[in-house]
Amino acid sequence: MRAVLTVAAAVLAARPVAADPTESRVLTAPTAWLPPSGAATATLGIDHRGDTAVFAGASLDGLAELEIDEDSDVRGCTDCAMQRTPLRLGRAGFRIGAHQDWLHGMPALVLGVRATFAAYEPAVDAPRVTDAYVVASRDLGVVRLHAGVDALAASVADHRSAAALRPLAGVELHPPMYPRSSLLGDLAWEPELDAVHGPVLRWMLGIGVRYQAFSWGSVELAVRARQGDDLGGATVMARFNAIARR
């Protein structure tokens, strides 16, 4: 019992990793962290297949954030039993929320929405994805926890799906002996756009590490597995995150 109390005290008392850029996502799952007033964020990523991702965000007085990104997280197919093709989509989002301890003991809370505004050389006709989510995040020192719910809707060709609720979860572990390093894990969802049968939601599990290389930037290396893929279908990716403060 004494050992359990000692570990619990260490978790609650340990200081968070210093100078950590304010990340709006763990790996794929969103967080409730918002950048400080006047800050701008950017992420550049590439995976082992050569697919790239670009993200940019701008703070609105520290209470909200505008986002724009281009990635290939969504898959599309005309015969999903044979091949699922990454779809490069441009998406824009808006997030608004409250910071941690706005009321004593309260986690950070964010309401976010995101919608497709462009599709680049899509393998299927008229792909679109829209989602709205609520996420709570809490910094406990060596551990940061994230939990929420996502309402996703998608359409492809003449098929449209109604919004469906799915859980979101994430964890960041900051070992005190490695103050610049973090272990990351999350659960998120993206649609598979089947041009024949319509959209289907698929879970994505991610695990990775983040290294705080600079006070303004961090490097991530991660592996993501997607529902329906075998081990060879897992994605290995590297990302660089940066934040500019006013």
Q: What is each of the regions a protein language model found here?
A:
Residues 4-18:
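Hydrophobic h-region of N-terminal signal peptides that target proteins for export
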Residues 15-43, 172, 176, 181, ...:
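Outer-membrane beta-barrel biogenesis signature
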Residues 29-31, 41-45, 79-85, 119-125, ...:
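Outer-membrane beta-barrel domain signature
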Residues 41, 53-55, 91-95, 133-135, ...:
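Membrane-embedded beta-strand positions in outer-membrane beta-barrel channels/transporters
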Residues 46-50, 60-62, 68-76, 98-100, ...:
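Transmembrane beta-strands of outer-membrane beta-barrel pores
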Residues 68-165, 169:
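Outer-membrane pore/translocation modules
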Residues 92-94, 211-212, 230-246:
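Outer-membrane beta-barrel "beta-signal"
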